[in-house]
C-alpha cells in the first residue's frame, strides 16, 4: 500500500512524491500502484534498493533482475552506478537529473530510480550530504511558468562567454542582427560541420589554438559561461579543456530537450528552436565593447598559420580545399579528416556534410552519392 499512499500524496499536493523500497519482491509489490499512476499520469518517483548486478542469478538473498522492471509503465527507468571515481559521480548525477526532469517532460508521469548497493550495507559514516549539481529544463520560452527576464539577465554577470556550435544542416541560418549582437559578447567556436549557423567571425581553428596554450593560459581563458547548440563536435581537445576547466554555467539549446552533457558541466536545457532562443536571448545582452577575452581568442586564431605540409594527408586535404568552388558541397569522412579541414579556410557558402552520428567512416561515399543524385551542386 506504500505506493498508493505516495500516489495520494502526489494527488493532494500537486507535487511529485517518492516511495522507497528494498530489493527483490518488495519492488514488485509496487507494480499495481505504478500501473495506476501511469494511467492517471501522476508524478511518482519509485526508488528501489538493489544488489550489485554480479549477484543476480547467483542464489543471493532478495535478488531479482530489477533494471527496467516496470517496462512501459514508467516514463524513464535508470539504474545508478556505484560511485567509485569522478566519472561514476558525474554519471550518477546525470542519471538522477534525467529521471527527475522526466516527471514533467512532455506531460506528467512517473519514473523509477534503481540503486545498487554493495556490502557492507549498514556502514553509514557520512554526516552531511554534499551539494550536487541540479540541471533545469525549460520547455519553450513561455513566461507563464518561468521568469525568463530574470534568467537571461544573469548572463550579464559573466565576462568570459563562449558559444560552441555543433553539427547543423546548411538550411538553418541566423539573422544577421542576431549574429552581430552575439559577436560583441561571445567567443564562437565552430567546426565547419555547423555550416552557416554561426557568424562569419567564428573561430574554426580552436583545436590548434588549444594545443598551443600553456596550462596557465587555458585556465585563465576558460569560459565562465558556455552556450551550446547543434549536434556533434569532433574535437576531443575542446571537450578535455572544458572538463578540466568547467564554466560556472552551461546552457544547451535543443528542440528535443534531451539531456546531453558532453562537457560534464550542464546546468540548463532549453527545449526550443535555437533561432527562437537567440532572438529572445540576445535582447537581454547589455551593450559592451569588444572585451579582452574576445580579443585574446581572436589574436590566437590569427597567429595559427595554415599548415604547409605538401607530402602528407594534411597537405592533400589542404590542396583539395583550396580548389573547392563556392556554393559546392563537401562531404568529409570522419575524425582526422574533419580536424585537418579545420586548419584551412573553406568558402563560407560551401556546405559541409559528415556522417558524425556514430563517428564511423562507413557509408561516407554512399551518402555523398545519394546527395549528389538530387542536387545540382558540385
What are these regions (language model features)?
Residues 95-98, 102-157:
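Conformationally flexible catalytic loops at phosphate/diphosphate-handling active centers
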Residues 29, 165-251, 347-377:
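Glycine-rich, anion-gripping cofactor-binding loops and their flanking helix/strand elements
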Residues 27-28, 34-77, 106-110:
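Hydrophobic or amphipathic alpha-helical targeting/insertion segments
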Amino acid at each position: 500500500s506504500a505506493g498508493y499512499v505516495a500516489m495520494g500524496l502526489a494527488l493532494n499536493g500537486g507535487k511529485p512524491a517518492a516511495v522507497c523500497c528494498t530489493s527483490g519482491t518488495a519492488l514488485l509489490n509496487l507494480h499495481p500502484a505504478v500501473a495506476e499512476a501511469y494511467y492517471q499520469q501522476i508524478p511518482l518517483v519509485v526508488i528501489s534498493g538493489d544488489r550489485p548486478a554480479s549477484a543476480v542469478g547467483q542464489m543471493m538473498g532478495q535478488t531479482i533482475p530489477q533494471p527496467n522492471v516496470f517496462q512501459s509503465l514508467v516514463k524513464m527507468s535508470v539504474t545508478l552506478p556505484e560511485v567509485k571515481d569522478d566519472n561514476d559521480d558525474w554519471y550518477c548525477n546525470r542519471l538522477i537529473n534525467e529521471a527527475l526532469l522526466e516527471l514533467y517532460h512532455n506531460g506528467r508521469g512517473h519514473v523509477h530510480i534503481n540503486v545498487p548497493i554493495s556490502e557492507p550495507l549498514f556502514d553509514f559514516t557520512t554526516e552531511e550530504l554534499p551539494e550536487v549539481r541540479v540541471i533545469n529544463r525549460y520547455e519553450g520560452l513561455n513566461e507563464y511558468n518561468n521568469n525568463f527576464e530574470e534568467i537571461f539577465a544573469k548572463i550579464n554577470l559573466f565576462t568570459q562567454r563562449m558559444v560552441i556550435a555543433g553539427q547543423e544542416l546548411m538550411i538553418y541560418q541566423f539573422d544577421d542582427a542576431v549574429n552581430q549582437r552575439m559577436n560583441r559578447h561571445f567567443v564562437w567556436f565552430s567546426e565547419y560541420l555547423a555550416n552557416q549557423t554561426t557568424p562569419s567571425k567564428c573561430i574554426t581553428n580552436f583545436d590548434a589554438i588549444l594545443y598551443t596554450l600553456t596550462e596557465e593560459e587555458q585556465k585563465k581563458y576558460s569560459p565562465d559561461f558556455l552556450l551550446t547548440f547543434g549536434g556533434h563536435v569532433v574535437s576531443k581537445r575542446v571537450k578535455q579543456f572544458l572538463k578540466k576547466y568547467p564554466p560556472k554555467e552551461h546552457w544547451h539549446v535543443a528542440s528535443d530537450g534531451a539531456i546531453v552533457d558532453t562537457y560534464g558541466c550542464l546546468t540548463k536545457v532549453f527545449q526550443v528552436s535555437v533561432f527562437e532562443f537567440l532572438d529572445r536571448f540576445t535582447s537581454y545582452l547589455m551593450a559592451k565593447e569588444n572585451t579582452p577575452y574576445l580579443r585574446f581568442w581572436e589574436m590566437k586564431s590569427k597567429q595559427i598559420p595554415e599548415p604547409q605540409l605538401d607530402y602528407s594527408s594534411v597537405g592533400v586535404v589542404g590542396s583539395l580545399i583550396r580548389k573547392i568552388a563556392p556554393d559546392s558541397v563537401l562531404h568529409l569522412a570522419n575524425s582526422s579528416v574533419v580536424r585537418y579541414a579545420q586548419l584551412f579556410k573553406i568558402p563560407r557558402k560551401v556546405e559541409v556534410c559528415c556522417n558524425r552520428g556514430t563517428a564511423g567512416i562507413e557509408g561516407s561515399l554512399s551518402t555523398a552519392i545519394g546527395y549528389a543524385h538530387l542536387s545540382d551542386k558540385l
